[in-house]
Amino acid sequence: MRSFQRGALDLRPVVLTPGVSRYAEGSVQVEFGHTKVLVTCSTEERVPPHLMGKGSGWVTAEYGMLPRATHSRNQRESAKGKQTGRTMEIQRLIGRSLRAAVDLSTLGPRTLTLDCDVLQADGGTRTASITGAYVALVLALRSLQKAGTISKLPKLTPLAAVSVGIVKGEVRVDLDYDEDSTADVDLNLVATADGRMVELQGTAEHQLFDRKALDAMVDGGLAAIQKLTAAQAQVLG
C-alpha cells in the first residue's frame, strides 16, 4: 500500500498556503504529503548583464534544504562554503521552468527571484518547489501591479511539476522518499495546464525502459499536473 492509501496514479494530499511571508512580494507554503517547501518571490529593479539595455526581465531561482529537513541533520551548504551539484541542478531546473511561465519581455528591466527552502523532505522536493513557485510568482506580479510598478499582468502560462516512476513494475505518480529510493525508473515532468511539456528528465536507475513505459509515465504525469494546476487556480482565484 502506498502512503496515504492512494492508488498508483494518485497524488499525495496537496496543500498550497499563500501569503505565509510578511515581507516577500509573493509567497506560498506547498505541501506534497509530508514534503513541505516554503517559496518566496522577491523583485529587484535590475537584470543580469546579458539583459541590460534590452528592456526585458528575468526570472531565476535558488533552492536549499534546512539542516533537519531529512531524517538526520545535514550541514548547511553555506557552512561548507559551496553548493552541491544537486542543489545547482535543481535551482536551474526551477528557474528554467518558471521562465517558461511568463513572457519575460513584458516584465520590464527587473528580476524576480524564487527562493525555495525545503522545510521537510519526503521525496519530490523539486517538483513541489516548481508547483509552489508558480503561485508565488503570480502573487508577486499581482503585488507589482497593485503598487503601480507594472501597469498590467504579463501573459502567464500555468504550469506545475510532478515525479513519476516505475516501482515494482508499476507506473506510479508523485513518489515519496521510500518509493524514489527504490524506483527502477525515475522521471520528473514539468508541464503546462494544457499538456505542453516544459521539461522531461528520465533515468533508468535499475532497469531499462521502453517507449511504451515512457508514454505511460508521461500520461500519468500529465494527468497529475492537470490536478496540480487546478489546485493552483483555486488558490489564486
Curated annotation (Swiss-Prot):
One biological process GO term for this chain?
Answer: rRNA catabolic process
Q: What class of enzyme is it?
A: transferase
So where does phosphate get bound?
A: 86, 124-126
Instruction: Provide the reaction this enzyme catalyses.
Output: tRNA(n+1) + phosphate = tRNA(n) + a ribonucleoside 5'-diphosphate
Record-linked InterPro entries: ExoRNase_PH_dom1, ExoRNase_PH_dom2, ExoRNase_PH_dom2_sf, PNPase/RNase_PH_dom_sf, Ribosomal_Su5_D2-typ_SF, RNase_PH, RNase_PH_bac-type, RNase_PH_CS
Q: Does the keyword RNA-binding apply?
A: yes
Q: Output the Gene Ontology terms for molecular function.
A: 3'-5'-RNA exonuclease activity; tRNA binding; tRNA nucleotidyltransferase activity
The UniProt keywords, alphabetically, are: Nucleotidyltransferase, RNA-binding, rRNA processing, Transferase, tRNA processing, tRNA-binding
- What's its EC? 2.7.7.56
Q: Name one Pfam family in it.
A: RNase_PH
NCBIfam families linked to this entry: RNasePH
Q: Which family does it belong to?
A: Belongs to the RNase PH family.
Please describe what this protein does.
Answer: Phosphorolytic 3'-5' exoribonuclease that plays an important role in tRNA 3'-end maturation. Removes nucleotide residues following the 3'-CCA terminus of tRNAs; can also add nucleotides to the ends of RNA molecules by using nucleoside diphosphates as substrates, but this may not be physiologically important. Probably plays a role in initiation of 16S rRNA degradation (leading to ribosome degradation) during starvation.
Q: How does it assemble?
A: Homohexameric ring arranged as a trimer of dimers.
Which PANTHER family does the record match to this protein? EXOSOME COMPLEX COMPONENT, EXOSOME COMPLEX COMPONENT RRP41
Q: What is this protein called?
A: Ribonuclease PH
Q: Which organism is it from?
A: Myxococcus xanthus (strain DK1622)
Recorded name of the encoding gene: rph
